[in-house]
Amino acid sequence: MKEKLIAVVLLFILTAILPIAVSKCSERSFAKPTVSTSDTPEKPKDSGEILCALTAGSYKDSYSAETLKAIAILMNTNYKANPDSFKANDFLYEENASGSIKDVYGEIKKAAESAKNKTLRKNSEALFVPYSETSNGITYKNENYKYIHSVASPWDCYQTDFDANAECVGVSLSGIDYLCKNGCSAEEALLWYLPDFEIADD
């Protein structure tokens, strides 16, 4: 009888304590989570880092330092003219670089630094300039870029990855590289493809 009485008393005590314990647990589970540093947004990139990342995104092992400068001027122009035209995979930031690109990222930084105040302009306006890796020996006009003219790009035929069906509007990066390796400055190479443009200091 004594044992039954103890069991009943314990049952009453547990019945009284259980709702309190449940409410404490539920308070914990609905508490606001703490924000870890991994949840905080990344520090915004400055314009120099963005230009480096865009230049690195177009890099090839064969490119000369002068070619990198030409690409940096082109990327600077396009980013200023239409920043929304770029996708996430167009950017290669230093912390994500690997292999040969990581080894030359210092050169890419130099090219970007030398180009950060230069833009391609037509009638004093920075306009988006389309580009391709290579052409089939000539660049084409396009209805979307009426300010771009067709020019000869015969040196693209010397490329090991030459494609007779490639259609390039604007600038051929392989052509720029050929011109830069054969005595042209970055500015001269760009203006070959864009004869109606000028390179202005911002």
Positions of the model-derived regions?
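Conserved, single-site charged/polar hotspot
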Residues: 1-202
